[in-house]
């Protein structure tokens, strides 16, 4: 396979990934591959560009490092070109409503006829099969959260709230990435392709597992948070200091002992309710739970964030200031690790945003390109798989492909 022009870098150099999907979930999987060195081709509708393009800034992050192909993959010669592309593809990711590709004639079996080693990842709200009531429904972040039991666990005691920004999309996209890589590893061992069925609600069901297990194995429903505090454990969650907010996790024998001395609760240490060796204080089951919260709230409110951080560092209590977005760039840890970076857009502007993560020591990721325009790489991609200038012109003339203006 001849690769498209791009630098060689990262742990996935030489892997070709193609994705078809809009907005966040499916494309996020493609974005991860692209930042780790894979050659990633982004398929867009010929007539209508990905709706993410209407956003002013986010697409410059979510579509960097990609090659843009505008092709009608379901019709006539456009379908033929797509299947030709699949012959040189390692991983194909599609995000749609249920088995939408199969309904339009592009089944796993059709794809494997053209490439028996292809890894196919189907990402949808409710999966590729199930009941007619759900399988073909559209789904976004909040739908997956609501249907999975994840949303009902978030929010405050007064009202459930979805977790933002777009948590289900990102978890599902990352699941597609990891599952596809696992499948690719096996394919290289066996030579046999794989198809992966990723239902967003099942991803969120698994991500919401912690408290659910108490219900599935005992019928206990965990309450939601109160003002950002852990529903089970005292000293864990969001707290207000004299000049802002911190989060903390009061976990550990020494940590509890020393913290209780600071906040005036040394007398309850070693009691039947807080016996020696206590590592966590249950806010409901422990009779002293409410008192711990009361004393801790008062102590924190009387101290600045800096003072609290310094003291908790001495006690080895995990805590962090709740940073505002403007505070991120100047934070010394962000600066030291270059967590925020800049890159050039295709029209020559400078864009700022999150850097590549995670950080590979020997084969680091790289930002080599901004978001391509609609159809920017169509001609180059089609030439790469054997199409002539005349062939491409014919596809464009029939409305089956779009090249950059």
UniProtKB/Swiss-Prot annotation:
Entry GO CC: cytoplasm
Pfam families in alphabetical order: CoA_transf_3 (PF02515)
First-listed, main subcellular location of the protein, grouped into a coarse class: cytoplasm
Residues the record lists as binding CoA: 97, 104
Enzyme class label: transferase
A GO term, aspect molecular function: L-carnitine CoA-transferase activity
The protein's Enzyme Commission number: 2.8.3.21
Compartments (UniProt record): Cytoplasm
Claim: Transferase is one of the keywords in the record: yes
Active site: 169 (nucleophile)
Pathway(s) per entry: Amine and polyamine metabolism; carnitine metabolism
Keywords of the record: Cytoplasm, Transferase
GO BP, sorted A to Z: carnitine metabolic process
Stretches assigned to coiled coil: none
Catalytic activity: crotonobetainyl-CoA + (R)-carnitine = crotonobetaine + (R)-carnitinyl-CoA; 4-(trimethylamino)butanoyl-CoA + (R)-carnitine = (R)-carnitinyl-CoA + 4-(trimethylamino)butanoate
Subunit: Homodimer.
Summary of the function given for this chain in its UniProt record: Catalyzes the reversible transfer of the CoA moiety from gamma-butyrobetainyl-CoA to L-carnitine to generate L-carnitinyl-CoA and gamma-butyrobetaine. Is also able to catalyze the reversible transfer of the CoA moiety from gamma-butyrobetainyl-CoA or L-carnitinyl-CoA to crotonobetaine to generate crotonobetainyl-CoA.
Family: Belongs to the CoA-transferase III family. CaiB subfamily.
Protein name: L-carnitine CoA-transferase
Species of provenance: Salmonella typhi
